[in-house]
Amino acid sequence: MGQGLWRVARNHHLQQEAYSETGYLSREQSRRVASSNISHTSHRKQAQGGIDIYHLLKARKSKEQEGFINLEMLPPELSFTILSYLNATDLCLASCVWQDLANDELLWQGLCKSTWGHCSIYNKNPPLGFSFRKLYMQLDEGSLTFNANPEEGVSYFMSKGILDDSPKEIAKFIFCTRTLNWKKLRIYLDERRDVLDDLVTLHNFRNQFLPNALREFFRHIHAPEERGEYLETLITKFSHRFCACNPDLMRELGLSPDAVYVLCYSLILLSIDLTSPHVKNKMSKREFIRNTRRAAQNISEDFVGHLYDNIYLIGHVAA
Protein backbone atom coordinates (compact mmCIF):
# COMPACT_ATOMS: atom_id res chain seq x y z
CA MET A 1 0.00 0.00 0.00
CA GLY A 2 2.77 2.42 1.00
CA GLN A 3 4.84 1.52 -2.04
CA GLY A 4 1.84 2.15 -4.30
CA LEU A 5 1.30 5.61 -2.85
CA TRP A 6 5.01 6.36 -3.23
CA ARG A 7 4.90 5.34 -6.94
CA VAL A 8 1.84 7.54 -7.56
CA ALA A 9 3.52 10.55 -5.90
CA ARG A 10 6.78 9.96 -7.82
CA ASN A 11 4.98 9.67 -11.16
CA HIS A 12 3.04 12.87 -10.43
CA HIS A 13 6.28 14.69 -9.56
CA LEU A 14 7.98 13.47 -12.72
CA GLN A 15 5.02 14.58 -14.81
CA GLN A 16 5.25 18.08 -13.29
CA GLU A 17 8.99 18.21 -13.97
CA ALA A 18 8.44 17.11 -17.55
CA TYR A 19 5.76 19.77 -17.96
CA SER A 20 8.01 22.44 -16.47
CA GLU A 21 10.91 21.43 -18.65
CA THR A 22 8.73 21.46 -21.73
CA GLY A 23 7.39 24.94 -20.82
CA TYR A 24 10.88 26.17 -20.11
CA LEU A 25 12.15 24.91 -23.45
CA SER A 26 9.25 26.48 -25.32
CA ARG A 27 9.72 29.78 -23.52
CA GLU A 28 13.46 29.73 -24.11
CA GLN A 29 12.92 28.98 -27.77
CA SER A 30 10.46 31.89 -28.05
CA ARG A 31 12.91 34.22 -26.29
CA ARG A 32 15.71 33.25 -28.65
CA VAL A 33 13.49 33.78 -31.68
CA ALA A 34 12.43 37.21 -30.39
CA SER A 35 16.02 38.10 -29.58
CA SER A 36 17.03 37.06 -33.05
CA ASN A 37 14.30 39.23 -34.55
CA ILE A 38 15.31 42.23 -32.42
CA SER A 39 18.94 41.75 -33.30
CA HIS A 40 18.06 41.51 -36.96
CA THR A 41 15.88 44.65 -36.74
CA SER A 42 18.59 46.52 -34.81
CA HIS A 43 21.17 45.49 -37.34
CA ARG A 44 18.89 46.67 -40.12
CA LYS A 45 18.36 50.04 -38.35
CA GLN A 46 22.07 50.42 -37.79
CA ALA A 47 22.64 49.73 -41.43
CA GLN A 48 19.95 52.23 -42.36
CA GLY A 49 21.46 54.79 -39.94
CA GLY A 50 24.83 54.24 -41.48
CA ILE A 51 23.36 54.90 -44.89
CA ASP A 52 21.70 58.13 -43.64
CA ILE A 53 24.93 59.37 -42.05
CA TYR A 54 26.77 58.50 -45.21
CA HIS A 55 24.37 60.54 -47.30
CA LEU A 56 24.54 63.46 -44.84
CA LEU A 57 28.33 63.47 -44.85
CA LYS A 58 28.33 63.18 -48.60
CA ALA A 59 25.92 66.10 -48.92
CA ARG A 60 27.94 68.17 -46.46
CA LYS A 61 31.12 67.38 -48.31
CA SER A 62 29.53 68.41 -51.58
CA LYS A 63 28.35 71.67 -49.95
CA GLU A 64 31.84 72.35 -48.67
CA GLN A 65 33.19 71.74 -52.12
CA GLU A 66 30.63 74.12 -53.59
CA GLY A 67 31.38 76.86 -51.01
CA PHE A 68 29.09 78.66 -48.53
CA ILE A 69 25.49 77.71 -47.95
CA ASN A 70 23.08 79.56 -50.21
CA LEU A 71 21.79 82.28 -47.88
CA GLU A 72 18.83 82.95 -50.14
CA MET A 73 17.35 79.71 -48.86
CA LEU A 74 16.78 81.30 -45.43
CA PRO A 75 13.23 82.41 -44.56
CA PRO A 76 12.59 86.05 -45.54
CA GLU A 77 11.64 86.97 -41.96
CA LEU A 78 15.01 85.77 -40.67
CA SER A 79 16.84 87.52 -43.47
CA PHE A 80 15.08 90.85 -42.79
CA THR A 81 15.90 90.56 -39.09
CA ILE A 82 19.58 89.98 -39.82
CA LEU A 83 19.79 92.80 -42.35
CA SER A 84 18.09 95.28 -40.00
CA TYR A 85 21.20 95.24 -37.78
CA LEU A 86 23.56 96.20 -40.59
CA ASN A 87 24.73 99.69 -41.45
CA ALA A 88 24.94 101.10 -44.95
CA THR A 89 28.41 99.72 -45.68
CA ASP A 90 27.57 96.22 -44.50
CA LEU A 91 24.29 96.26 -46.41
CA CYS A 92 26.13 97.06 -49.62
CA LEU A 93 28.40 94.10 -48.95
CA ALA A 94 25.40 91.92 -48.13
CA SER A 95 23.79 92.90 -51.41
CA CYS A 96 26.41 90.79 -53.15
CA VAL A 97 24.89 87.75 -51.43
CA TRP A 98 21.29 88.77 -50.81
CA GLN A 99 20.67 90.78 -53.95
CA ASP A 100 16.90 90.85 -53.67
CA LEU A 101 16.68 91.41 -49.92
CA ALA A 102 19.38 94.07 -49.76
CA ASN A 103 17.51 96.07 -52.39
CA ASP A 104 14.14 95.70 -50.69
CA GLU A 105 12.51 99.12 -50.30
CA LEU A 106 10.63 98.25 -47.11
CA LEU A 107 13.88 97.32 -45.41
CA TRP A 108 15.59 100.58 -46.36
CA GLN A 109 12.49 102.57 -45.44
CA GLY A 110 12.56 101.04 -41.95
CA LEU A 111 16.27 101.81 -41.59
CA CYS A 112 15.74 105.42 -42.64
CA LYS A 113 12.83 106.10 -40.29
CA SER A 114 14.39 104.30 -37.32
CA THR A 115 17.53 106.44 -37.55
CA TRP A 116 16.09 109.71 -38.86
CA GLY A 117 12.57 109.82 -37.49
CA HIS A 118 11.47 112.92 -39.39
CA CYS A 119 12.36 114.25 -42.82
CA SER A 120 10.32 116.58 -44.97
CA ILE A 121 10.61 114.17 -47.89
CA TYR A 122 8.67 111.52 -45.95
CA ASN A 123 5.49 113.58 -46.34
CA LYS A 124 5.90 114.34 -50.03
CA ASN A 125 5.16 112.42 -53.19
CA PRO A 126 8.41 110.64 -54.06
CA PRO A 127 10.14 112.04 -57.15
CA LEU A 128 10.92 109.93 -60.18
CA GLY A 129 13.68 107.43 -59.48
CA PHE A 130 13.34 107.77 -55.71
CA SER A 131 14.51 104.89 -53.52
CA PHE A 132 14.90 104.62 -49.76
CA ARG A 133 18.27 102.98 -50.26
CA LYS A 134 19.54 106.09 -52.01
CA LEU A 135 17.87 108.26 -49.36
CA TYR A 136 19.65 106.33 -46.60
CA MET A 137 23.00 107.00 -48.25
CA GLN A 138 22.17 110.70 -48.55
CA LEU A 139 21.03 110.93 -44.92
CA ASP A 140 24.18 109.21 -43.76
CA GLU A 141 26.32 111.52 -45.88
CA GLY A 142 24.44 114.58 -44.65
CA SER A 143 24.84 113.56 -41.01
CA LEU A 144 28.58 113.16 -41.44
CA THR A 145 28.70 116.57 -43.12
CA PHE A 146 26.69 118.13 -40.27
CA ASN A 147 29.07 116.66 -37.68
CA ALA A 148 31.92 118.38 -39.47
CA ASN A 149 30.11 121.63 -40.34
CA PRO A 150 26.48 122.08 -39.23
CA GLU A 151 25.60 124.78 -41.76
CA GLU A 152 26.95 122.74 -44.65
CA GLY A 153 25.12 119.67 -43.37
CA VAL A 154 21.75 121.45 -43.29
CA SER A 155 22.43 122.95 -46.73
CA TYR A 156 23.17 119.46 -48.04
CA PHE A 157 19.85 118.13 -46.74
CA MET A 158 18.00 121.00 -48.38
CA SER A 159 19.83 120.62 -51.69
CA LYS A 160 18.76 116.98 -51.87
CA GLY A 161 15.14 117.85 -51.05
CA ILE A 162 15.32 115.95 -47.76
CA LEU A 163 14.52 118.99 -45.59
CA ASP A 164 12.47 122.10 -46.26
CA ASP A 165 14.00 125.48 -45.52
CA SER A 166 11.88 125.96 -42.41
CA PRO A 167 12.95 126.32 -38.74
CA LYS A 168 10.13 124.00 -37.68
CA GLU A 169 11.16 121.27 -40.14
CA ILE A 170 14.81 121.55 -39.09
CA ALA A 171 13.78 121.38 -35.43
CA LYS A 172 11.70 118.23 -36.03
CA PHE A 173 14.61 116.64 -37.87
CA ILE A 174 16.99 117.39 -34.98
CA PHE A 175 14.48 116.22 -32.37
CA CYS A 176 13.98 112.83 -34.08
CA THR A 177 17.63 112.18 -34.96
CA ARG A 178 20.35 110.69 -32.77
CA THR A 179 23.25 110.66 -35.25
CA LEU A 180 24.21 114.33 -34.87
CA ASN A 181 27.22 115.33 -32.81
CA TRP A 182 25.95 117.13 -29.70
CA LYS A 183 28.84 119.61 -29.63
CA LYS A 184 28.22 120.67 -33.23
CA LEU A 185 24.49 120.72 -32.56
CA ARG A 186 24.99 123.03 -29.60
CA ILE A 187 26.97 125.45 -31.78
CA TYR A 188 24.27 125.35 -34.45
CA LEU A 189 21.42 125.99 -32.00
CA ASP A 190 23.33 128.85 -30.40
CA GLU A 191 23.47 130.50 -33.82
CA ARG A 192 19.95 129.53 -34.95
CA ARG A 193 17.71 130.68 -32.09
CA ASP A 194 14.65 130.35 -34.32
CA VAL A 195 15.32 126.62 -34.66
CA LEU A 196 15.95 126.45 -30.91
CA ASP A 197 12.53 127.99 -30.19
CA ASP A 198 10.75 125.36 -32.28
CA LEU A 199 12.88 122.60 -30.80
CA VAL A 200 11.88 123.56 -27.26
CA THR A 201 8.18 123.51 -28.13
CA LEU A 202 8.49 119.88 -29.28
CA HIS A 203 9.12 118.78 -25.69
CA ASN A 204 6.19 117.67 -23.56
CA PHE A 205 6.85 117.99 -19.82
CA ARG A 206 3.29 117.35 -18.69
CA ASN A 207 3.06 115.69 -15.24
CA GLN A 208 6.84 115.41 -14.96
CA PHE A 209 8.78 116.24 -11.81
CA LEU A 210 10.91 119.33 -12.39
CA PRO A 211 14.39 117.69 -12.08
CA ASN A 212 13.35 114.81 -14.35
CA ALA A 213 11.98 117.21 -16.95
CA LEU A 214 15.21 119.20 -16.82
CA ARG A 215 17.22 116.02 -17.40
CA GLU A 216 15.12 115.13 -20.43
CA PHE A 217 15.55 118.66 -21.78
CA PHE A 218 19.33 118.54 -21.48
CA ARG A 219 19.46 115.10 -23.10
CA HIS A 220 18.08 116.62 -26.31
CA ILE A 221 19.64 120.07 -25.99
CA HIS A 222 23.00 119.75 -24.29
CA ALA A 223 23.95 122.40 -21.78
CA PRO A 224 27.11 124.42 -22.38
CA GLU A 225 30.18 123.56 -20.36
CA GLU A 226 30.36 127.05 -18.84
CA ARG A 227 27.84 129.55 -17.58
CA GLY A 228 26.88 132.28 -19.95
CA GLU A 229 24.17 133.86 -22.02
CA TYR A 230 23.37 130.62 -23.89
CA LEU A 231 22.75 128.69 -20.65
CA GLU A 232 20.49 131.48 -19.40
CA THR A 233 18.58 131.34 -22.67
CA LEU A 234 18.10 127.57 -22.38
CA ILE A 235 16.85 127.77 -18.79
CA THR A 236 14.51 130.64 -19.65
CA LYS A 237 12.98 128.76 -22.57
CA PHE A 238 12.70 125.59 -20.49
CA SER A 239 10.98 127.44 -17.64
CA HIS A 240 8.31 128.88 -19.91
CA ARG A 241 7.76 125.55 -21.63
CA PHE A 242 7.52 123.66 -18.32
CA CYS A 243 4.91 126.10 -17.02
CA ALA A 244 2.96 125.89 -20.28
CA CYS A 245 2.84 122.08 -20.01
CA ASN A 246 1.76 122.11 -16.33
CA PRO A 247 -0.64 125.04 -15.78
CA ASP A 248 -2.62 123.32 -13.01
CA LEU A 249 0.52 122.41 -11.08
CA MET A 250 1.86 125.93 -11.39
CA ARG A 251 -1.34 127.36 -9.93
CA GLU A 252 -1.37 124.79 -7.14
CA LEU A 253 2.24 125.49 -6.14
CA GLY A 254 2.04 129.20 -6.86
CA LEU A 255 4.97 129.07 -9.28
CA SER A 256 5.74 131.38 -12.17
CA PRO A 257 8.29 131.02 -14.99
CA ASP A 258 10.64 133.25 -12.99
CA ALA A 259 10.33 130.98 -9.94
CA VAL A 260 10.97 127.89 -12.09
CA TYR A 261 14.01 129.67 -13.52
CA VAL A 262 15.39 130.14 -9.99
CA LEU A 263 14.69 126.50 -9.14
CA CYS A 264 16.48 125.30 -12.28
CA TYR A 265 19.58 127.29 -11.43
CA SER A 266 19.45 125.98 -7.87
CA LEU A 267 19.21 122.40 -9.16
CA ILE A 268 22.20 122.87 -11.45
CA LEU A 269 24.31 124.33 -8.62
CA LEU A 270 23.21 121.55 -6.26
CA SER A 271 24.08 118.93 -8.90
CA ILE A 272 27.58 120.33 -9.21
CA ASP A 273 27.97 120.51 -5.44
CA LEU A 274 26.86 116.92 -4.77
CA THR A 275 28.60 115.24 -7.70
CA SER A 276 31.91 117.12 -7.89
CA PRO A 277 34.82 115.31 -6.19
CA HIS A 278 36.50 118.67 -5.59
CA VAL A 279 33.76 119.83 -3.21
CA LYS A 280 34.48 118.32 0.20
CA ASN A 281 31.77 120.02 2.26
CA LYS A 282 28.56 119.02 0.49
CA MET A 283 25.48 121.17 0.75
CA SER A 284 22.99 119.77 3.25
CA LYS A 285 19.28 119.50 2.65
CA ARG A 286 18.60 122.19 5.23
CA GLU A 287 21.04 124.60 3.56
CA PHE A 288 19.51 123.97 0.13
CA ILE A 289 16.01 124.65 1.41
CA ARG A 290 17.09 127.82 3.16
CA ASN A 291 19.03 129.20 0.16
CA THR A 292 16.30 128.34 -2.35
CA ARG A 293 13.46 129.82 -0.31
CA ARG A 294 15.51 132.94 0.21
CA ALA A 295 15.60 133.41 -3.59
CA ALA A 296 11.96 132.37 -4.12
CA GLN A 297 9.96 132.95 -0.96
CA ASN A 298 6.61 131.54 -2.08
CA ILE A 299 7.95 128.02 -2.71
CA SER A 300 6.84 125.22 -0.38
CA GLU A 301 9.52 123.85 1.95
CA ASP A 302 8.37 120.27 1.30
CA PHE A 303 8.57 120.77 -2.46
CA VAL A 304 12.13 122.11 -2.23
CA GLY A 305 13.03 119.17 0.01
CA HIS A 306 11.79 116.74 -2.64
CA LEU A 307 13.96 118.52 -5.19
CA TYR A 308 17.02 117.94 -3.02
CA ASP A 309 16.16 114.25 -2.55
CA ASN A 310 15.85 113.76 -6.30
CA ILE A 311 19.30 115.18 -7.01
CA TYR A 312 20.82 113.28 -4.09
CA LEU A 313 19.39 109.93 -5.23
CA ILE A 314 19.41 110.20 -9.04
CA GLY A 315 22.25 112.59 -9.80
CA HIS A 316 23.13 115.56 -12.00
CA VAL A 317 20.37 117.19 -14.03
CA ALA A 318 22.68 118.16 -16.89
CA ALA A 319 25.13 115.25 -16.99
From Swiss-Prot:
Domain of life: Eukaryota
One matching Pfam family: Sec7
Alphabetical list of InterPro entries matching this protein: F-box-like_dom_sf, F-box_dom, FBXO8_F-box, Sec7_C_sf, Sec7_dom, Sec7_dom_sf
Tissue note: High expression in brain, heart, kidney, liver, lung, skeletal muscle, testis, and day-7 embryos.
Tagged with keyword Magnesium: no
A molecular-function term among this protein's GO annotations: guanyl-nucleotide exchange factor activity
PROSITE patterns: FBOX, SEC7
Keyword Transcription: no
An example Gene Ontology CC term for this record: ubiquitin ligase complex
Keywords noted in UniProt: Guanine-nucleotide releasing factor
F-box domain location: 68-111
Residue ranges constituting the SEC7 domain according to the UniProt record: 146-276
Any one Gene Ontology BP term: regulation of ARF protein signal transduction
Role played: May promote guanine-nucleotide exchange on an ARF. Promotes the activation of ARF through replacement of GDP with GTP (Potential).
PANTHER family in alphabetical order: F-BOX ONLY PROTEIN 8 (PTHR10663:SF372), GUANYL-NUCLEOTIDE EXCHANGE FACTOR (PTHR10663)
Protein name: F-box only protein 8
Taxonomic source organism: Mus musculus (Mouse)
